[in-house]
């Protein structure tokens, strides 16, 4: 009890009412524009859609200052006095400003937490989403059961705002945030539909992801707390999640609710070989023991979502499967544990024995069908995987067209170089190569064969297959056997911070 009271007091001492004035500072919106402009896009760098104008920001801040624009009129609900006439453009600017402002205190708290845990030097590698796969390679081969869980969306955005209020005590800021979401997301309805949430997430991705991540961290904090109290393997790096208001009361209520199913103490959860991995809205729970314990955690998740977040979830939506008989999808890969059986002859004196040895190996496979579906959606091929031209790029120069296709191939190869088998990756690169050739032929109003014969582009287009080997040769010795072995083995790059549309994780 005392240790968590100390946590709460320390959290309260850091909470200050300073977020509201920042929303009226011009440099906040300039910072939001700069971060969006410099963000590297996975498919191609298209830049920022909306032009940044200091005059527009000044006009918007003036509107927000005026009291008559902050009054909600119930009799005239069709008009939008808060955002004015340019609703979509102003809402985009305001949402990015909200996202920048609200991230500031949590970034400072995260930095201090990392310094206390003495992992600040390796934080850049820990940020990589590919750092999950080396962990899975080490752990999954020793486990037997896995549960593939899709985290449900909250039924109302007010739940997300309430979760954020546990961390920051700034009433004016939250009034302004609610006012903005009220006009933009139509909070008149009791339940926010999945379609409206999807629209909000696409038009305001940064603010939505920030609110949604806090919703996920709220339930994860209780899960990690129970996990740490039931295991001798403490997760000190997640201590930042535990500093929140009413956390101890939630924990006591949770134990009381599950006393009937989980016994009267938390010692029932003792399992040193249960592992939890999450990315975005999908999490993987794996264990070595019998599925009885996995069922307990399954019901814990369901009751937690229903009791604390008013999110309805059915038990049948969470399945528990044997790893040797089930494959699951994570971060654009298909993962399954394959059993390798081998027979060893053993001789003892005059007797000879045949011993069967079973070993496990984690297969990480490139999903060819979802990738072809993504390429077809981007108009690089049809639904059967046959390459087609990209006429919208025909106005660019030959060098720019080839550079665009090379960038996509380079990023795909960079992302999927950890796969067990490279055949699917080579098929995708082959589709992009032919699509590039057809696009160039379409630009020059010629057939593919005539264009290649006339321009002699074979050597230039060989970069689709040779560039990766040249990069590896700069890192490793120029030995053909070494490069051949590297092409067969998995290589994880710890500089990949996010996935994109071509990496379909549905």
Curated annotation (Swiss-Prot):
Gene Ontology BP annotations: mRNA processing; RNA splicing; tRNA processing
GO cellular component: chloroplast
Main location: plastid
Superkingdom of origin organism: Eukaryota
Cell compartment(s), UniProt: Plastid, Chloroplast
Record bears the keyword Acyltransferase: no
An example Gene Ontology molecular-function term: RNA binding
Keyword terms, alphabetized: Chloroplast, mRNA processing, Plastid, RNA-binding, tRNA processing
Coiled coil: none
Keyword presence, Plastid: yes
HAMAP family, A to Z: MatK
Function: Usually encoded in the trnK tRNA gene intron. Probably assists in splicing its own and other chloroplast group II introns.
Family from the record: Belongs to the intron maturase 2 family. MatK subfamily.
Official protein name in the record: Maturase K
Species of provenance: Melilotus albus
Organism taxonomic ancestry: Eukaryota, Viridiplantae, Streptophyta, Embryophyta, Tracheophyta
């Amino acid at each position: 009890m005392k240790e968590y009271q100390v946590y709460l007091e320390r959290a309260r001492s850091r909470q200050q009412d300073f977020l509201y004035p920042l929303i009226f500072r011009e440099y906040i919106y300039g910072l939001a524009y700069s971060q969006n402009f410099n963000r590297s896009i996975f498919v191609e760098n298209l830049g920022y859609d909306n032009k940044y104008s200091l005059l527009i920001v000044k006009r918007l801040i003036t509107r927000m200052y005026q009291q008559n624009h902050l009054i909600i009129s119930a009799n005239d609900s069709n008009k939008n006095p808060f955002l004015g006439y340019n609703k979509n453009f102003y809402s985009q600017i305001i949402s990015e400003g909200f996202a920048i402002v609200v991230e500031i205190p949590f970034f400072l708290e995260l930095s201090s937490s990392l310094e206390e845990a003495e992992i600040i030097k390796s934080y850049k590698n820990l940020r990589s989403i590919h750092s999950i796969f080396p962990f899975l390679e080490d752990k999954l081969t020793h486990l037997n059961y896995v549960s593939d869980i899709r985290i449900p969306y909250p039924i109302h955005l007010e739940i997300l705002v309430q979760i954020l209020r546990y961390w920051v005590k700034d009433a004016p800021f939250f009034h302004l945030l609610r006012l903005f979401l009220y006009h933009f997301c139509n909070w008149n309805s009791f339940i926010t539909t999945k379609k409206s949430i999807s629209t909000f997430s696409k038009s305001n991705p940064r603010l939505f992801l920030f609110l949604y991540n806090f919703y996920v961290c709220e339930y994860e904090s209780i899960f990690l707390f129970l996990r740490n109290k039931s295991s001798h393997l403490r997760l000190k790096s997640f201590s930042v999640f535990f500093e929140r208001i009413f956390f101890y009361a939630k924990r006591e209520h949770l134990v009381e609710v599950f006393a009937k199913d989980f016994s009267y103490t938390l010692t029932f959860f003792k399992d040193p070989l249960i592992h939890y991995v999450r990315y975005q809205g999908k999490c993987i729970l794996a264990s070595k023991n019998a599925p009885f314990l996995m069922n307990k955690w399954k019901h814990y998740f369901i009751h937690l979502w229903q009791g604390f977040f008013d999110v309805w979830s059915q038990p049948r939506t969470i399945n528990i499967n044997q790893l040797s008989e089930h494959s699951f999808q994570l971060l654009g890969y298909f993962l399954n544990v394959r059993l390798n059986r081998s027979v060893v002859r053993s001789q003892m004196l005059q007797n000879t024995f045949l011993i069967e040895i079973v070993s496990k190996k984690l297969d990480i496979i490139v999903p060819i069908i979802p990738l072809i579906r993504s390429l077809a959606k981007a108009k690089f091929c049809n639904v059967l995987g046959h390459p087609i031209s990209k006429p919208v790029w025909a106005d660019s120069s030959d060098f720019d067209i080839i550079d665009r296709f090379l960038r996509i191939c380079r990023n795909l190869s960079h992302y999927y170089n950890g796969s067990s088998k490279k055949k699917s990756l080579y098929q995708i690169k082959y589709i992009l190569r032919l699509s590039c050739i057809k696009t160039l032929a379409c630009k020059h109003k010629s057939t593919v064969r005539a264009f290649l014969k006339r321009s002699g582009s074979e050597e230039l287009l060989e970069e689709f297959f040779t560039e990766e080997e040249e990069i590896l040769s700069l890192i490793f010795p120029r030995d053909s056997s070494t490069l051949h072995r590297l092409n067969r083995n998995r290589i994880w790059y710890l500089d990949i911070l996010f996935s994109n549309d071509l990496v379909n994780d549905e």
